[in-house]
């Protein structure tokens, strides 16, 4: 998906906080969760998410979707990664 189309989709789906970020290579983030829904599009590099006993690697062009409160750990790839991320507060 093209970045502009991804950002437009985020806005349509109520993701108000949208930014492009970079993550450094090889960093491991232990198990944690976020108070908001996250949706990200990996632009370059790769990351591996460990969630509910399973691991999945995401590369350029892949979309990551995490619901608020989902516990996960992250391992940045050997070259790090860049991504567009949207955050949405969960509906009460």
Q: Predicted regions: what is each one?
A:
Residues 1-11:
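Extreme N-terminal tail/first-helix region
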Residues 7, 28-34, 51, 75-76:
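Short histidine-centered beta-strand/loop micro-motifs
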Residues 17-34, 68-69:
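Conserved short histidine dyad/triad with adjacent acidic residue
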Residues 33-49:
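Short, conserved beta-strand element in jelly-roll/cupin
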Residues 25-26, 44-47, 89-92:
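Short, charged/polar surface micro-motifs in flexible loops or helix N-caps
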Residues 68-92:
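Ligand-binding loop in jelly-roll beta-barrel domains
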Residues 52-69:
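Short acidic-glycine-tyrosine-enriched beta hairpin
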């Amino acid at each position: 998906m093209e970045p502009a189309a991804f950002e437009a989709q985020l806005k349509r789906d109520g993701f108000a906080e949208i930014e492009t970020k970079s993550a450094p290579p090889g960093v491991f983030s232990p198990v944690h969760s976020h108070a908001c829904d996250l949706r990200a599009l990996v632009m370059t590099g790769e990351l591996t998410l460990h969630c509910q006993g399973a691991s999945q690697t995401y590369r350029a062009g892949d979309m990551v979707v995490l619901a608020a409160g989902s516990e996960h750990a992250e391992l940045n790839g050997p070259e790090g990664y860049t991504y567009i991320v949207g955050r949405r507060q969960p509906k009460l």
